From Swiss-Prot:
Alphabetic keyword roster: Chloroplast, Hydrolase, Metal-binding, Metalloprotease, Plastid, Protease, Transit peptide, Zinc
Gene name of the encoded protein: SPP
Superkingdom per UniProt: Eukaryota
Native source species: Oryza sativa subsp. japonica
Presequence positions on this chain: 1-136
Top-level taxonomy: Eukaryota, Viridiplantae, Streptophyta, Embryophyta, Tracheophyta
Signal sequence, start to end: none
Gene3D superfamilies: Metalloenzyme, LuxS/M16 peptidase-like (3.30.830.10)
Annotated cofactor note: Binds 1 zinc ion per subunit.
Protein's name according to its UniProt entry: Stromal processing peptidase, chloroplastic
InterPro entries in alphabetical order: Metalloenz_LuxS/M16 (IPR011249), Pept_M16_N (IPR011765), Peptidase_M16 (IPR050626), Peptidase_M16_C (IPR007863)
Length: 1246
């Protein structure tokens, strides 16, 4: 769903955001997207995981919010069994939008703040496992259970110090887990249940979510999609919700199988008068959920929007997700009630039919209200809830429901639904005698979702289903999913928590083992993932083995995956593995529990909502940690292997009489494949071949796992002392004029240093995240330094270094386990302007020194391997070949090549360019940029000055970095294609079974610091025009006006004004193109502002239908060019300011944001970045005027001669095939297609 324009202030990538480039992050290209149900407990077994995880930073929607799903509240105590997905189980609840592959999508931001700390590599779970810092981790199965009381001594001891009696142990394990001490639950007389949780982050704001327990699973045969329709009509038709927008509140809604959620993120008080906003927010939710207006005009408007959304969602990824869900749940309605609905039915419903469905399901007893945030006076909040909702009764229900005591048990959320009553509601029509019948109380269903499953349990007699095969011309790679479906194990006792912990240990070992197979240059698989997680939306626990491979390698890939699963099942984990992963989990839990007061309200709320759906006990982080410590002491190696083996039996024992049968086996395969020397041939595969390959893999001989030596340090104390004697590290003067070796700014707390080898250092001490630090190395150059003979050398080089993952004499496996033991997340990335490394580390047990050791080893003792180069080259080759199979990526690719005059530095390298590269050439391209005065390191965290400066001197001061850089001299000219040209407007046609369309419109813009193409300094233009004006002015110029002229000369003037402009244009696009004209569901305006290069551009992205896409493009152009005829008004500017300032204020509570603010503070290639850009950011936003915005608007090139557009159309009648020479349309490689369920939930409504 199209996001309402309120993107985060600083959502662009830190100093150098990703550009409009047709592609997903390389990690996505190299590794299949997560096994779709977005189960956070999935384990990426063999993604190209390595300690130096590589990302060529690409397009990310600024509104893209990672919403996590869940194993359960109590299992938060030990963390997810795997990675965090991009998005929820099926799509994008709460503001999340699918980032368009191929387009860099950025929030309007003056100072971008993050290169991607949220996706840092976790040493524990591999490249695909993005264990984010737990500001985000309030989800039900996140590792939030750390305790500040777990000592190093305790970590070193055996987990069971003294024998414990069997009866005593059983008694302890059967004890219920403690409940969250601050969570308040209650129920009104009409059945509405509410939950209130005080939470301090973000300050002065709260979340209010109304969950109505009705979704697509409750629809009848002729109502498919009607729950989603009601979500739209009720939400967007609410006048009370609209009134809140002026207060700085944000709102949205989404629909899934089992529920519909309306949510508002609001300040606690109005800015102007300090009035309490809680009553207004509750009133708006009451109107939306229980008193919507089903006017014909609103229904028709939303019908158009939903039909557009349906076509937009209908990607190959969505179709694959549907296939997986259909086979997994073939025995129940989950296989056929996708939330978006059926197009033919959406066309038919009139307001009365929609209203009848609402009357049947939208009543207080079938809803739960969640309030999380700065709610200091809980009794008052309860009174406000009662005042707003107490009198809301379902139509025809006169008698109040009996009062229930506040419910503490999870099961009370699932009161049984009475079978009788309201027969008329089954048809949606009122009986004439309805008023004479005694009203019957309506309560929510006892089971959500109300479906029956066929379980994959040992000894359950049922016929095995043969593997299903889904073939499509838009699928590029082979993937197979083996599913096992069992009832949810509700985590309510210590025994339940202990089981989750043991599974986590077992599956972590499986990931690491299979990952070692990436040592070979040509592994048979692209990725192997094992996902084990609970799903509230499906009402079951699903284990999924997902294998992806190049089509020609599919048999070998299956054999390797099932063979490794059987080996672990038969031999189990070793004592060393159990100790290692247990220690890592305990350390992780300590770190995360320290952040108990830093978890955002929305994440806590999601955590509670999903936990309640699964009936897991909800604990806070400290309770969870204490519970984890208690059960950890009882875990034995034998039990870990027993519990883990049960998870894997459906694979390891496949074909045996008593083995649990897979719920489904589904292969998604291309119709045609490219064979070297042959060309395109049909891809043939049969179910029995799949079965034979599984059995063959299980029959391979197996051997136990050898123990691996894990280094405790990468640089010994004696080695360090020798280095210090040789290189004599010291801090040098920051200025040639003065002998100043340190600058400290009292207002921001930022310290600046410079080492004698030329490396610049910025750091800030914060308590945002207790005993956690983040660090970023930025190296100037990036892809811009590639010349015509070395296209792709930088990104392939960075990927090669990452693929190898070795440093010095340590293997990749040793380095990865070193990261596991020290809770270090690390990534290595590149974009057009920079190469950068990012670290996230815990400060306990010398974690910061360990992170600095790793950085030192990468800089001093990096290892370049031929097989890693081969893998990196193959990954980019495969990704390039997959572009023609994606409508969005093909369209974006063609636009980029045209706009930037076929400059390959801004798109994926072509096969021709890749063939020219060698290991030495890519190594030189990367390492030539790693010179002293071209490197800047920023560190933010909860450390002391002594700690950070000691690490800096010891490990960065001893780097033998050259002191001069000639990077600037090697940047070839970058220019926009001149007008006139046939390439200013293009079209792309993709053959597909279903129709879809999208378009991109782009044009030149200045960079963040006021430089335009050809190096023109726009501040000179401003000074020239203002100088002419001053000649005629009085000498008594108003002081305020003079101050404002100072604002216009501020180095961040264009960054600020363009950010505000983007907010306003986004809002107008939504209102005009989507809401008024009904031409699209999803339209957005994004700015791409470089820091170092003297250019930038804007992008409008719009999805539509083939019949409307040209009109949508014209409408977007009209909005873009209409700012002169339809002037910006103060109300629009105020709203844009409020949105960006509130997000800035909220983000300053995070380390990652500060890391971005520090970027380039001492960079000679970004001379206009200085401390005032950080100190005066708020003032600059507040001071901006409409006239300032028009000054910036004059330098957005929106005329016909500067504007580029490309329309992409997919359908059976594909028109002319794309003839772009850069794309080899006949080659089909691997492309990420997502996984089960990722795209089936509806987009957020706005």
């Amino acid at each position: 769903m199209a996001s309402f324009p309120s993107p985060p202030l600083a959502a662009a990538a830190a100093a150098a955001p990703p550009r409009l480039a047709p592609g997903l992050p390389l990690a996505a290209a190299a590794v299949r997207r997560p096994s779709s149900l977005a189960r956070r407990s999935s384990i990426a077994l063999a993604a190209p995981a390595n300690p130096l995880r590589c990302i060529h930073r690409r397009a990310v929607s600024p509104r893209l919010r990672r919403r996590t799903e869940a194993v359960g509240a109590a299992s938060a105590a030990i963390g997810s069994l795997g990675e965090e997905r991009e998005g929820c189980l099926s799509c994008f609840p709460r503001g999340r939008r699918r980032g368009r592959p191929g387009l860099a999508r950025f929030a309007p931001c003056a100072l971008p703040h993050t290169y991607g700390l949220s996706s840092l590599h976790s040493g524990l779970t591999g490249a695909k496992i993005r264990r984010r810092h737990v500001l985000h981790a309030a989800g039900p199965d996140e590792p939030h259970v750390a305790s500040p009381t777990w000592s190093e001594t305790a970590l070193d001891k055996h987990y069971v110090d003294q024998p414990i009696g069997k009866e005593e142990l059983e008694g302890f394990l059967n004890t219920p887990l403690p409940s969250h001490p601050k969570l308040v639950r209650g129920q009104l007389k009409n059945g509405l249940r509410y939950l209130i949780l005080p939470n301090k982050v973000p300050a002065n704001r709260f979340e209010a979510h109304m969950e109505v327990h009705v979704g697509s699973i409750d629809e009848e045969e002729d109502e498919q999609g009607i729950a989603h329709m009601i979500e739209h009509v009720a939400f967007l038709g609410s006048k009370k919700r609209e009134k809140l927008l002026g207060t700085g509140a944000r709102s949205n809604a989404y629909t899934d199988f089992h529920h519909t959620v309306f949510h508002i993120h609001s300040p606690t008080k109005t800015k102007e008068y300090g009035e309490d906003l809680l009553p207004s927010v509750l009133d708006a939710l009451n109107e939306i959920a229980f008193h919507p207006k089903f006017s014909s005009s609103r229904v028709e408007k939303e019908r158009r929007a939903i039909l557009s959304e349906l076509q937009m969602m209908n990607t190959i990824e969505y179709r694959v997700d549907c296939q997986l869900l259909q086979h997994l749940h073939s025995e129940n309605k989950l296989s056929e009630r996708f939330p978006i609905g059926l197009e033919e039915q959406i066309h038919k419903w009139d307001p009365d039919k929609i209203r009848r469905f609402h009357e049947r399901w939208y009543y207080p007893a079938n809803a739960t209200l969640y309030l999380v945030g700065e709610i200091d006076d809980i009794p008052r909040a309860i009174r406000e809830i009662e005042a707003v909702f107490e009198h809301t009764l379902p139509e025809g229900e006169a008698a109040p429901m009996s009062t229930a005591s506040p419910f503490g048990a999870m099961a009370s959320l699932f009161a049984p639904k009475l079978p009788g009553g309201l027969a008329a509601s089954l048809t949606g029509e009122r009986s004439p005698a309805a008023d004479k019948i005694k009203p019957v109380k309506r309560e929510r269903q006892a089971i959500r979702p109300p479906v029956e499953h066929k379980w994959s349990l040992p000894g359950v007699a049922q016929d095995a289903k043969p593997p299903a095969i889904f073939q499509h011309e838009l699928i590029q790679s082979f993937s197979i999913n083996m599913f096992c479906k069992i009832p949810v194990n509700q985590v309510q006792t210590y025994k339940d928590l202990r089981s989750v912990l043991m599974k986590r240990i077992f599956l972590s070992a499986l990931h690491f083992r299979i990952n070692t197979r990436y040592k070979s240059s040509n592994p048979p698989f692209t990725s192997v993932e094992l996902d084990h997680s609970d799903s509230g939306r499906e009402g079951c626990t699903v284990t999924t083995l997902t294998v992806t491979a190049e089509p020609q390698n599919w048999r070998s890939a299956i054999k390797v995956a099932v063979h490794e699963v059987r080996r672990l099942k038969e031999f189990g984990v070793t004592m060393g593995e159990m100790t290692r992963y247990m220690d890592a989990l305990i350390k992780d839990s300590e770190q995360l529990a320290m952040m108990i007061d830093s978890v955002p309200s929305v994440d806590n709320l999601d955590f509670i909502m999903e936990s309640d759906a699964l009936r897991h006990t909800v604990m806070d982080q400290l309770q969870g940690h204490e519970s984890l410590l208690a059960v950890a002491e009882t875990v034995t190696l034998e039990e870990v292997n027993t519990v883990g083996a049960e998870v894997l039996e459906f694979i390891s024992d496949y074909g045996k009489p008593d083995a649990p049968l897979p719920a489904a086996i589904v292969a998604c395969v291309p119709k045609k494949v490219h064979m070297d020397g042959v060309g395109e041939t049909d891809f043939e595969i049969h179910p029995e071949e799949i079965t034979d390959s599984i059995k063959a893999g299980l029959e391979e001989p197996i051997y136990p796992e050898p123990e691996l030596e894990v280094p405790k340090e990468l640089i010994t104390r004696s080695e360090l002392e020798d280095l210090k004697l040789q290189r004599k590290p010291s801090f040098a003067s920051l200025s040639k004029e003065e002998n100043v070796v340190k600058i400290f700014d009292d207002e921001t707390g930022i310290a600046q240093r410079r080492l004698s080898n030329g490396i610049s250092i910025n750091y800030k001490i914060t308590q945002n995240e207790a005993r956690v630090g983040v660090m970023r190395l930025i190296v100037g150059g990036g892809r811009a330094t590639e010349d015509s003979e070395s296209k792709g050398s930088v990104i392939v080089g960075v990927r090669t270094l990452s693929e190898g993952g070795c440093v010095g004499n340590f293997s990749r496996e040793q380095v990865e386990l070193f990261c596991v033991n020290n809770l270090i997340n690390c990534s290595l990335e590149s974009n057009e302007e920079f190469i950068f490394m990012e670290f996230r580390f815990a400060l306990r047990d010398n974690g910061m020194r360990a992170a600095f050791q790793l950085l030192h080893m990468v800089l001093e003792h990096n290892v370049w391997l031929e097989d890693a180069f081969d893998r990196a080259t193959q990954l980019y080759l495969s990704y390039y070949r997959s572009i023609p199979k994606s409508l969005e990526r093909s369209t974006a690719h063609k636009l980029m090549l045209a706009m930037l005059n076929h400059d390959e530095r801004f798109v994926e390298p072509s096969p021709h360019s890749l063939q020219k590269l060698t290991l030495q050439s890519v190594k030189d391209a990367v390492m030539n940029q790693f010179v002293g005065d071209n490197m800047e390191v920023s560190i933010v965290g909860d450390f002391t000055e002594e700690e950070v400066e000691s690490c800096v001197l010891d490990y960065l001061g001893t780097v033998s970095a050259p002191k001069s850089s000639k990077t600037q001299e090697h940047i070839e000219k970058i220019s926009f294609l001149p007008f006139p040209s046939d390439l200013h407007f293009q079209q792309v046609y993709i053959k597909d079974t279903d129709e879809r369309a999208c378009a991109y419109i782009a044009g030149p813009a200045p960079n963040r610091w006021g430089f335009a193409t050809e190096g023109n300094d726009l501040f000179n233009v401003i000074r020239s025009s203002s100088g002419d004006a001053q000649v005629s002015e009085s000498a008594n110029t108003d002081l305020t006006e003079r101050k404002h002229n100072d604002v216009r000369s501020h180095s961040l003037f264009f960054g600020i004004t363009l950010s505000l402009l983007a907010e306003i244009i986004n809002s107008r696009l939504f209102t005009t193109v989507r809401d008024s004209m009904g031409l699209t569901y999803d339209v957005s305006f994004e700015l791409n502002l470089f820091d170092k290069l003297d250019l930038g551009w804007y992008v409008i992205a719009v999805t539509s239908t083939p019949s409307k896409v040209h009109k949508a493009v014209d409408a977007c152009k009209g909005v873009l060019r209409g700012l002169h005829s339809n002037k910006i008004v103060e109300r629009e500017l105020d709203r844009a300011k409020r949105t960006l300032l509130m997000k800035h204020e909220a983000e300053t509570k995070t380390n990652a944001y500060w890391l971005g603010l520090l970027a380039h503070l001492q960079s000679s290639s970004v001379p206009r970045k200085e401390i005032s850009c950080i100190k005066e950011l708020t003032m600059l936003y507040e001071s901006a005027t409409i006239e300032d915005l028009y000054l910036a608007y004059e330098h957005l090139k929106v005329d016909e001669s500067s504007l580029f557009a490309c329309i992409g159309i997919a359908g059976a009648e594909s028109g002319e095939e794309t003839t772009d020479d850069e794309l080899d349309m006949g080659l089909h490689g691997m492309g990420p297609i997502g996984g089960r369920g990722l795209s089936t939930m509806t987009r957020p409504t706005t």
